[in-house]
Swiss-Prot record:
Reaction it catalyzes: CMP + ATP = CDP + ADP; dCMP + ATP = dCDP + ADP
Main location: cytoplasm
Cellular location(s): Cytoplasm
Listed InterPro entries: Cytidylate_kin, Cytidylate_kinase_dom, P-loop_NTPase
GO molecular function: ATP binding; CMP kinase activity; dCMP kinase activity
Organism lineage: Bacteria, Pseudomonadati, Pseudomonadota, Gammaproteobacteria, Vibrionales
CDD domains: CMPK
Name of this chain's protein: Cytidylate kinase
Enzyme Commission number(s) of this protein: 2.7.4.25
UniProt family annotation: Belongs to the cytidylate kinase family. Type 1 subfamily.
Positions of ATP binding: G12, P13, S14, G15, A16, G17, K18, G19, T20
Keywords assigned by UniProt, alphabetized: ATP-binding, Cytoplasm, Kinase, Nucleotide-binding, Transferase
GO cellular component annotations of the record: cytoplasm
Length: 226
């Protein structure tokens, strides 16, 4: 019998297009959305709002356990709602990023956020975006996707994004950054970046987003049909 609250996981390296794919899938399927990459920034922002020390595990664990956050897919955009307030813009501030780095280094906080992420699983279903969703957070997920693309293609996409914002960046610098991050993610001791054994690996190097969504939906529908 199909699950009443199926989980779809999408993992992969930085710049592969996970965020866009997950937003579109959640929108098309009418499922909840979890952006695990933003969860530490959300917790850091909640700590700042409540005057909680971002280096105190004792203070942060209860905040993480009861974190009141929603990720709302609106086409290719995602709104982050913290305690009823749209904080999408605040999440990108440098202060939030610095605080998130401190928060992410605390083991008990990471464990509390792991449990909080699992609590996102609810009817009618969940699309979870991250790096270890299918291998650690939702091991029993009904459908797992690992979205990949060559480092060169990811650097090219990033270059276009930054140039559209009027920034002067070099392709070789972006490529080096991506390759270094890939190396760190794939060789870290805890939850290294890798496809789950039962995941569909999609290489988006030579596909546009419409083709990626089509392949992903076909796979998800076949898995959910049992």
């Amino acid at each position: 019998m199909p699950s009443q609250s199926p989980v779809i996981t999408v993992d992969g390296p930085s710049g592969a297009g996970k965020g866009t794919l997950c937003m579109l899938l959640a929108d098309k399927l009418g499922f909840h959305l979890l952006d695990s990459g933003a969860i530490y920034r959300v917790l850091a922002l909640a700590a700042i709002h409540h005057g909680v020390d971002t280096e105190s595990e004792d203070a942060l664990v209860p905040l993480a356990t009861h974190l009141d956050v929603q990720f709302i897919a609106e086409g290719e955009l995602v709104k982050v709602i913290l305690e009823g307030e749209d904080v999408s813009g605040e999440l990108r501030k440098e202060e939030t990023g610095m605080a998130a780095s401190k928060v992410a280094a605390l083991p008990r906080v990471r464990e509390a956020l792991l449990r909080r992420q699992r609590a996102f699983s609810a009817a009618p279903g969940l699309v979870a975006d991250g790096r270890d969703m299918g291998t650690v957070v939702f091991v029993e997920a009904e459908a797992k996707i690992f979205l990949d693309a060559s480092a060169e293609e990811r650097a090219s996409r990033r270059l276009k994004q930054l140039q559209q914002k009027g920034l002067d960046v070099k392709f070789d610098d972006l490529l080096s950054e991506i390759q270094e991050r890939d190396d760190r993610d794939r060789n870290r001791p805890v939850a290294p970046l890798r496809p789950a054994e039962d995941a569909l690996v999609l290489d988006s190097t030579s596909m546009n987003i419409e083709q990626v969504v089509e392949k992903a939906l076909h796979y998800i529908e076949s898995k959910l049909a049992g």
